[in-house]
């Protein structure tokens, strides 16, 4: 089930990083981000990666040149991406639309897609070679908002890797931008979907007022020492594949009385429970599961087509670790469903208000775990003219945030993959517990009395 992040040896020859600016003049202005955008929990860089095969129909065309030129054209419409972030009163983030541009790296690798093999997955072990961390480019304020590297392969394919300042967009907004680059690369002069800024739609009310309980932003100070922060340098990475058999085994553990539940709900509950068991959390510690929910079109909350800002919230459910670990999977699923049920127009407004009232706090970290379902985000659909990628998805998870992505394993089986970061001994226990949970299980039989 697990795909270890094993070493992969090949060399990459990179050119000096360039700045790509909008192809035409753009407005010089300062635009505020929304109160959903600029919270502390969005102030990081999110990496994505896409692997493309050689396409005989594109013979003679250089993906580096095609994408670089299309990028400049797309930035005319998405000109805020070519600016730099600044911070105002109460830590309010704004983008100074300077037109300075984004970072772009041209590269060549002495390998092929076939040789990459199992590296074509989340937690790609060679990612640092495929997206060079340009010194000084990772700060949230004053740095380029996007970094792109296009790496040609010996087979004629290529790899597109990108890093985005998450305060600017979520996955849906990023895909909208990438689709525009793809359209420009294939000859369009105007995007089929024009970008909309309008970040004020997700600003706090006046006056702001917190009207909902937000477990995802609670300050946790007193713990029993089993909810420790994790140092990324001491963690190991694994990607876990869930095919038809694993999903069936998990569903066979559920009673009919639970009712309908999605594959994502089942996986989220399973990973959360196994992870908590692996950490050997004190039974009396409070743990929480946070659900990332895209608010576009949900519960009557309409955002205009083309809106490319962050448009998601992360409602959470809490329980004692002992309750989560000793109860069957059904218990965890009900908590996942409970968190998702918090989503409403009022909940969204309450989050924005909380950001202003409490100074844009970071989400709760001790005892928290979050999984985002990006299977419908469209990362596997972006076409620069060479067709859809062999794989497209988030390149890295975070210690307490992971992602569910669609994936086809080496056997050709389609399923879901979830990358995980954990300390080595915890990872070993997590994998053992996950194997136990996904073994072929007996169907639950409930009494008819």
Curated annotation (Swiss-Prot):
It is an enzyme of class 2 (transferase). The keyword Membrane does not apply. Its EC number is 2.3.1.232, 2.3.1.196. Pfam families: Transferase. It catalyses: anthraniloyl-CoA + methanol = O-methyl anthranilate + CoA; benzyl alcohol + benzoyl-CoA = benzyl benzoate + CoA. InterPro entries: CAT-like_dom_sf, Plant_acyltransferase. Optimum pH is 7.0-9.0. K(+), Ca(2+), Mg(2+) and Mn(2+) increase enzyme activity while Cu(2+) and Zn(2+) inactivate the enzyme. Expressed in berry outer mesocarp, but not in berry skin. GO terms for molecular function: acyltransferase activity. The active site is at 166 (proton acceptor), 383 (proton acceptor). It comes from the Eukaryota. Keywords: Acyltransferase, Transferase. Belongs to the plant acyltransferase family. Acyltransferase that catalyzes the formation of methyl anthranilate, a compound implicated in the 'foxy' odor character of Concord grapes. Can use a variety of alcohol substrates when assayed with both benzoyl-CoA and anthraniloyl-CoA. No AMAT activity can be detected in Vitis vinifera grapes. PANTHER family: ACYL TRANSFERASE 4 (PTHR31147), OS05G0315700 PROTEIN (PTHR31147:SF66). Monomer. This is Methanol O-anthraniloyltransferase. The lineage of its organism: Eukaryota, Viridiplantae, Streptophyta, Embryophyta, Tracheophyta.
């Amino acid at each position: 089930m697990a795909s270890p992040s094993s070493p992969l040896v090949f060399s990459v020859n990179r050119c000096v990083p360039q700045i790509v600016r909008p192809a035409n003049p753009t407005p010089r202005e300062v635009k505020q981000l929304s109160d959903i955008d600029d919270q502390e929990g969005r102030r990081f860089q999110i990496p994505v990666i896409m692997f493309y095969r050689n396409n005989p129909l594109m013979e003679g065309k250089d993906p580096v040149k095609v994408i670089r030129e299309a990028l400049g054209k797309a930035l005319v419409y998405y000109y805020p991406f070519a600016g730099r972030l600044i911070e105002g009163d109460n830590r309010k983030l704004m983008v100074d639309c300077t037109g300075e541009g984004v970072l772009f790296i041209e590269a060549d690798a002495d390998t092929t897609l076939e040789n990459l093999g199992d590296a074509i997955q989340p937690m790609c072990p060679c990612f640092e070679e495929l997206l060079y961390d340009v010194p000084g480019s990772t700060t949230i304020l004053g740095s380029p908002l996007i970094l792109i590297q296009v790496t040609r392969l010996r087979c004629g394919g290529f790899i597109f890797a990108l890093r985005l300042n998450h305060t600017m967009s979520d996955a849906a907004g990023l895909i909208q931008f990438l689709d525009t680059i793809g359209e420009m690369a294939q000859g369009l002069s105007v995007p089929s979907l024009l970008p909309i800024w309008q970040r004020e739609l997700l600003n706090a009310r006046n006056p702001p007022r917190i009207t909902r309980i937000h477990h995802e932003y609670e300050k946790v100070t007193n713990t029993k020492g089993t909810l420790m922060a994790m140092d990324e340098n001491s963690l190991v990475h694994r990607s876990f594949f869930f095919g038809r058999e694993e999903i069936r085994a998990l569903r066979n553990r559920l009673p009919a009385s639970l009712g309908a539940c999605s594959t994502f709900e089942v996986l989220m509950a399973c990973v959360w429970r196994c992870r908590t068991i692996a950490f050997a959390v004190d039974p009396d510690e409070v743990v929480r599961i946070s659900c990332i929910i895209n608010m576009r079109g949900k519960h009557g909350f309409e955002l205009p087509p083309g809106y490319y800002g962050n448009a998601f919230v992360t409602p959470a459910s809490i329980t004692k670790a002992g309750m989560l670990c000793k109860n069957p999977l059904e218990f965890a699923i009900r908590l996942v469903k409970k968190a998702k049920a918090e989503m409403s127009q009022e909940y969204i407004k309450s989050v924005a208000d909380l950001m202003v009232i409490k100074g844009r706090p970071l989400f709760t970290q001790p005892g928290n775990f979050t999984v985002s379902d990006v299977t419908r985000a469209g990362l596997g659909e972006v076409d620069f003219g060479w067709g859809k990628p062999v794989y497209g998805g988030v390149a890295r998870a975070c210690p307490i945030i992971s992602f569910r992505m669609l994936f086809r394993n080496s056997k050709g089986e389609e399923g879901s993959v979830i990358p995980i970061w954990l300390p080595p001994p915890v990872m070993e226990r997590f994998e053992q517990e996950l194997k136990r949970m996904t073994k072929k299980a007996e169907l639950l039989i409930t009494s008819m009395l």
